[in-house]
Regions:
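Bacterial N-terminal signal peptides
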Residues: 7-18
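Activation on beta-sandwich/Ig-like modules and their edge loops
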Residues: 19-183
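Positively charged n-region of N-terminal signal peptides that target proteins for export
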Residues: 1-6
Length: 183
């Protein structure tokens, strides 16, 4: 008997996504580089919507200190990386410069709350991650980042994330399960 998507989500303790929510989400976090002095921490944003988002004045109010420049946009389906040190990130992971912003002030911890706000101060997304289970443990000191399994999942839940590979660059979204299907 094949396992249906709903059964798979239930086994993982993840709520089934009803539909892809439009908007910009915190999609990937690299918070514990190996070695610790590498200065290649980053937060990746993904635009899940069908229109270009103008990020001018948007900012992180928790975790890191970074405000997006007035002319910053993110196309539908696009990605942006906010890096601790853009030059070091680019050298380490061959990340294309046009997708990397920064530097930000602060350091990501082994447990942090990241809050993304628009220019009016409204909360757009929030992730309160940790370095232990149910969060991906390979992201804690092993050099990996953690990435959202599907952009419509609640990214404030550890079960919605997985450890990423070592090549870190904006690419096709990680979609392990299609949204909008029922079992």
């Amino acid at each position: 008997m094949p396992i249906r998507p709903l059964q798979f989500f239930a086994a993982l303790g993840i709520a089934w996504p009803s539909a892809v929510a439009a908007g910009v989400v915190i999609n990937e976090i690299h918070y514990d580089a190996d070695p610790k002095t590498a200065a290649v921490e980053f937060v990746e944003l993904h635009n899940t919507g069908d229109r270009t988002e103008h990020l001018g004045g948007w900012y992180f109010s928790n975790g890191i200190d970074f405000t997006f420049a007035a002319n910053t946009t993110l196309k539908p389906g696009g990605y942006l990386v906010v890096a601790e040190n853009p030059a070091k990130l680019g050298a380490e992971f061959r990340t294309p410069k046009q997708f990397v912003l920064g530097p930000y002030i602060g350091r990501l911890s082994n447990g942090e709350t990241l809050t993304l706000r628009n220019a009016a101060g409204e909360q757009l997304d929030r992730v309160n991650y940790d370095s232990g289970f149910p969060w991906p443990t390979a992201a804690s000191g092993a050099g990996s980042s953690m990435e959202l399994i599907h952009p419509s999942l609640d990214n404030d839940l550890g079960g919605s994330w997985r450890s990423a590979g070592m090549l870190i660059e904006p690419s096709e979204p990680v979609v392990l399960l299609a949204a909008g299907r029922s079992g």
